[in-house]
Amino acid sequence: MEITTNQVYIALLASLIPAFFAFKLGKSLNQ
């Protein structure tokens, strides 16, 4: 099974976006 650069990019994005929103939400809740 070949892993293309596109798939790596999509997987990275898919894991980064929720983490980013969770971080923003956590910061706004702490204020």
UniProtKB/Swiss-Prot annotation:
Keywords: Chloroplast, Membrane, Photosynthesis, Photosystem I, Plastid, Thylakoid, Transmembrane, Transmembrane helix. Coiled coil: none annotated. One of its GO terms (cellular component) is photosystem I. GO terms for biological process: photosynthesis. The keyword Hydrolase does not apply. Signal peptide: none annotated. It is a single-pass membrane protein. It is found in: Plastid, Chloroplast thylakoid membrane. The chain crosses the membrane at residues 7-26. Its main location: plastid. SUPFAM superfamilies: Subunit XII of photosystem I reaction centre, PsaM. The keyword Ion transport does not apply. Belongs to the PsaM family. HAMAP family: PSI_PsaM (MF_00828). This is Photosystem I reaction center subunit XII.
